[in-house]
Amino acid sequence: MIHITLPDGSQREYPGPVTVAEVAASIGTGLAKAALAGKVGTGDDAKVVDTSFVINKDMPLSIVTAKDADGLDVIRHSTAHLLAYAVKDLFPDAQVTIGPVIENGFYYDFSYKRPFTPEDLVAIEKRMAELAAKDEPVVRRVLPRDEAVAYFKGIGENYKAEIIASIPSNEDVSLYREGSFEDLCRGPHVPSTGKLKFFKLMKVAGAYWRGDHRNEMLQRVYGTAWASKDDLQQYLHMLEEAEKRDHRKLGRELDLFHIDEHSPGTVFWHPKGWSLWQEVEQYMRRVYRDNGYQEVKGPQILDKTLWEKTGHWDKYRENMFTTESEKRDYALKPMNCPGHILIFKQGIKSYRDLPLRYGEFGQCHRNEPTGGLHGIMRVRGFTQDDGHVFCTEDQIQPEVLAFTTLLQKVYADFGFSDIIYKVATRPEARIGSDESWDKAEAALINSLEASGCEYVISPGDGAFYGPKIEYTLKDAIGRQWQCGTIQVDFSMPERLDAEYVGEDGDRHRPVMLHRAIVGSLERFIGILIEQHAGAMPTWLAPVQAAVLNITDAQADYVREVAQKLQKAFPNQGLRVATDLRNEKITYKIREHSLQKLPYILVAGDKEKAAGAVAVRARGNKDLGVMSVDAFIELVAKDIAAKA
């Protein structure tokens, strides 16, 4: 007898070996129809299998449907194969290579004699729908490696043969067939093509075979697939919104920054963009000051001997920019932590000095591949709001609790209230005692519970030197951005010999907490631009108000108004632009509206005589005529409320 344990804990008994599909059918016809795959085993041993998978011993089983994350992966993987099937059907000379699942979709790489056109994509997608409607069964078979190589060579699929030839000769490989198309794949796949209904092909791009620029350039067709029509439409709508909000596009239109071919992966900030940067940095500087952090500044270039001690020279060197001077090797720092330990080590530290908090706007460089660069979101040169707390094990929990509370306040001020909390726990390979890990993990979890946060645990995803919390924010269109982190580190203080004198008079190693709230300022500003679609809140806006005259007769008055606004705010003044051009007022209003300014002030003869201005708020909202003092009061409230 075979005993199957279901997710609710109930058991079902079968007289002999049974397939996943048969188990689903025995539970109910609805589940049998919805079944896409099965998940057998538990924990690290759990795996997703085809519905044709035969269960021949007692084991746990859950039926995977389109409602499950695993089900969505199976749908996307199978849709990638459906894409390849359609391409081979329409373009028999095309050769197939690889087609994995990626975030929100899939791609498949093809070798073909000419580039695919937009019209080709339309035809391929139409053919995919036709093949799906035929509801052809997807059938798995297993071949010895050499036999599989011969099979694919025999049908002219040389790329597939090359992939299989790289597999050890004593291994079998699995193939999946749907209709006339058969592909190499580990699986699992949907039981039939009729399960694939909601998909769309997105674009074609170039990709080198095996990622090597010396190899042939292939055509990579990207697509997306979802469990329902609503999910697909929602995703496509989100993409439309994301395109409108693209920080690269808005950066050009709003004259904030540009990326230049003379320095790929680094940002040229224009005056307006640098104003935005300064607002973010000065805000975060106040956060440092108000929460017990001492701001420090370390050098950007450090000798390789330091990076050898930290382990970066061996494990991270290819991502570091290196240079040589007077027969010594140096590297531009990819992170700030070693420098902060060197500062900590200057002078004797006592337990009374702990927790000791350092903060730095540290400029770092990482040699990211050119293909991975993306506007100001993924760069080679970036500045972090990088902080490090040196403390005892007993101080971890209160420090993390205070940090989480602070992070929530900062994110709310920038317009983000939806935060996802993830605790990454100990991996198999790690340093430090189990007792220290127990204490550190409990401190992270207890701190989140004390702050009322719901969290998920990601087992084994911690670094080898300590557990961490990752803070991921959701933006206005539902995208997730992992920005904040707090990481416990038992290793680096040991590697760099950091010590403090304890209450017992002996020397002890401090625990090091790496923490960042916004992370890379460049990336965070890119997120802000997209979150607000370029229409920055008044307190952040590079230009907070523009004052416009109707005729030359009001030019001097406009200058007076601008001067008064600038003087009204003692720290740095309101950021005001004047527009005295001899253009129609409607033209000037429209031009400044396109720059997404919070306020446009218009002065004609009546306003000049009354010592007032006509105020338009963003979104073409007419607030009427008011005194300059009344407008100052209005803006002051906006800024105070971070509106």
Curated annotation (Swiss-Prot):
EC number, UniProt record: 6.1.1.3
Cofactor: Zn(2+)
Keyword Nucleotide-binding annotated: yes
Cofactor stoichiometry and binding remark: Binds 1 zinc ion per subunit.
InterPro entries (alphabetical): aa-tRNA-synt_IIb (IPR002314), aa-tRNA-synth_II (IPR006195), aa-tRNA-synth_II/BPL/LPL (IPR045864), Anticodon-bd (IPR004154), Anticodon-bd_dom_sf (IPR036621), Beta-grasp_dom_sf (IPR012675), TGS (IPR004095), TGS-like (IPR012676)
Swiss-Prot/TrEMBL keywords: Aminoacyl-tRNA synthetase, ATP-binding, Cytoplasm, Ligase, Metal-binding, Nucleotide-binding, Protein biosynthesis, RNA-binding, tRNA-binding, Zinc
Xref: CDD domains: TGS_ThrRS, ThrRS_anticodon, ThrRS_core
Keyword Transcription regulation: no
Pfam families linked: HGTP_anticodon, TGS, tRNA-synt_2b, tRNA_SAD
A biological process term (GO) from this entry: threonyl-tRNA aminoacylation
Region of interest (Catalytic), ranges: 246-537
Major enzyme class: ligase
Reactions catalysed: tRNA(Thr) + L-threonine + ATP = L-threonyl-tRNA(Thr) + AMP + diphosphate + H(+)
Subcellular location: Cytoplasm
GO CC terms: cytosol
SMART domains for the chain: tRNA_SAD
GO molecular function: ATP binding; metal ion binding; threonine-tRNA ligase activity; tRNA binding
Positions of Zn(2+) binding: C337, H388, H514
Domain TGS: 1-65
Family to which the UniProt record says this protein belongs: Belongs to the class-II aminoacyl-tRNA synthetase family.
Its biological purpose: Catalyzes the attachment of threonine to tRNA(Thr) in a two-step reaction: L-threonine is first activated by ATP to form Thr-AMP and then transferred to the acceptor end of tRNA(Thr). Also edits incorrectly charged L-seryl-tRNA(Thr).
Oligomer and partners: Homodimer.
Protein name per its UniProtKB record: Threonine--tRNA ligase
Native source species: Delftia acidovorans (strain DSM 14801 / SPH-1)
Gene that this sequence comes from: thrS
